[in-house]
Every structure is written in structure tokens, then in C-alpha cells.
Amino acid sequence: MREKSWFREYGLILAAGVAVGIAALILTASGNPKNMGFCIACFLRDIAGALGLHSAANVQYIRPEIIGIVVGAAAAALAAREFRAKAGASPACRFVLGMFVMIGALVFLGCPLRMVIRLGGGDLTAVAGLVGFIAGILVGVVCLKKGFSLGRAYPVRMGEGFVLSGILMALLGLLLLVPTLLKFSEAGPGSMRAFWGISLAAGLVVGVLAQRSRLCMAGGIRDAVMLRDFKLLSGFLAIWGTVTIGNLVLGSYSLSALSQPIAHSQYLWSALGMALAGWGSILLGGCPLRQWILAGEGNGDSAVTVLGMIVGAAVSHNFGLAGAADSVAEDGTYVVGGIGTAGMAAVAIGFAVLLAITVTHLPKTEAVSRD
């Protein structure tokens, strides 16, 4: 009886984690960059580039994985009668938070999901990101305990919940039918891509399972700290375990802090970037993956958030905020990447903005006592 209860509680979330890990491995084997089989931040950066929102030629492509995630989540929510069109909870603040979550993630060179995938590939530089991510979540937990809230969303017309899905389906149509309207990378990460059908299918599977299991990278650590509930965290660990085992079997596991794919060794700024992403994710109620799932379920506030993320990706590359990967020069010299002064300033500004949003969304009694 106890075994059945355990399976009922953890079975779906573990299956979702394993599926995400397998999807990441398949996508990498099919052409996506190494240690980047699935990365919400990287995919949004590429989509922003494909739409001409930034001019970084190496990161431009409409990633079907994102389209699949949202459509899969919408289909799962409709089938389970959980689709709810709602909006109206601090949309402007959510847009800004989405921007800075993305800026922080691109300083690190990956979203929380890619952080786990990088760890599963043996990338020791991602440990700094994990430490920062946990620290940011802990700050967010303190904010929640103080009463932080972006407010309540209210029901809206059903059609509102399908707007984002419709936009993404239109992008898929452009990709397949009128690709000349879009920009495509001829070199760099944007040029490394799986066949669109494989990418779309992987996104659909992940979207369905993530919707049903409530999979969330930030939520797992938040619930473990606040509620001593390790259910969501088990999904986080399942992704890491699956990717690690898969890489070992495939011979692509490389335990090192040097020459890792699309990664840099400025550990402090990796940690700070992910701290910004972690804190912002808690204030938003979920990591970037979770925001896309919620948007697929009809949540207009999450739709605004992910649009903010796309703008954040564009801003990161237009103003040189994103991290640059370590590389090896022609003469064999190891060149450390990382971020420049603009990126450092953006992270500092991001922390200030998150603090301001936190203070202005505390209960009045808490805000008064703080003053």
C-alpha cells in the first residue's frame, strides 16, 4: 500500500524528469549543441534573433521545441479540463521580471534546465550556477515568507488563453512555409539544430508531461526549503540522473571545468547571474520552463512574462550583456570568456529592480515596518 502511495505521488514527476533528460539527449544527438539539448533561455535567444530582434548572427533560429512545449501544455490542460484563461496580476512587473530572469540566465549561458543538463554532461563550471541559483531561491523564499505577492489573476475570455499558442503556431508556419522571412544562423549555436519534426515532437512530449507533473526547476528547491516537500525536486534530480547516465553510455560525458560547450569560467558572475534568475523565478512563481507551461494553460500573466523573456534575450545581445564562452585560440592559448562591464552592470541593476519590486509588493504592514 505504501509503495502504491509513493508511486502515485512521485511516479509522474520522475517520469517527466526522465523524459526531459531523454529528450535532451536525443536532441543533442540529432544536431542541437552539446549540453544544450533543451534550454529555454538559449531557444528564446535564438527565436529573438530569427525575428530580427537582435543582430547576433550566430544565434538565430525559430526553435520548434518552444512551440511544442506550449502546444503540448495546452493540449494536456484541455484534456484534463485544467485550461483556465486568466490574467491581470501585475503584468508590467512580470514583464520586467521575465526580462531580468533572462538576462541573468544568459550571463550564465543557460536557463535552470540547461544548468542541470550541463551538470549531467560533467560541466563543473555549472556548479557555480547551481550555487547561485539556490542562493537566489533562498532570497525569494524569504520574500514569500514576508508576504510577497504579485496579486491574483482573474478570469478572462477563453480566446485570450490561446493567443500565445496562436502566435507560436504562426511562427511554425513561417518556419516551414515562408522561411525567407526569418533569419537563420550559418555558424555557431543557432546553426546547430535537430530536424524540425524531432524538435517539435520532443517539445510536445515535454509540454504534456511538464504540465501534468508541474515540473519546475525553481519550485523543487523552493518547496523543499519551505514545505519539506521533495516531490518537484525529484524531477530536477531525475533530469540530472538521466542526462548523466545517458552521456556516460554514449561516451560524451566529460568531467571538467575547461573547454565545456558554450560555457565560461567566470564563476562569480555565473553564480550571480543564476542568483538573479533564481530570485526572479521565485517572485514569478516558477522557472522559465514553468512559465511557458503556465502560458500554454491559458495564463495571460505568464504569457506576458515569456514575452518579457524574449525581449530580455534581445536586450542581452543588442547591448553585449550575455556571457561569452571560453575558447581556444589558433595558437592553442586558452581564452577565458565571461561577461563585460555592461553585463556586470545589468546584473547589479537586476538585483536592484527585483528588490524594488519585492518591497512594493509586500503587505502594507510589512512595508511600513521596513520603513
Specify the residue positions occupied by each region the protein language model found.
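Membrane-interfacial helix-loop segments of redox and metal-homeostasis proteins
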Residues: M1-D371
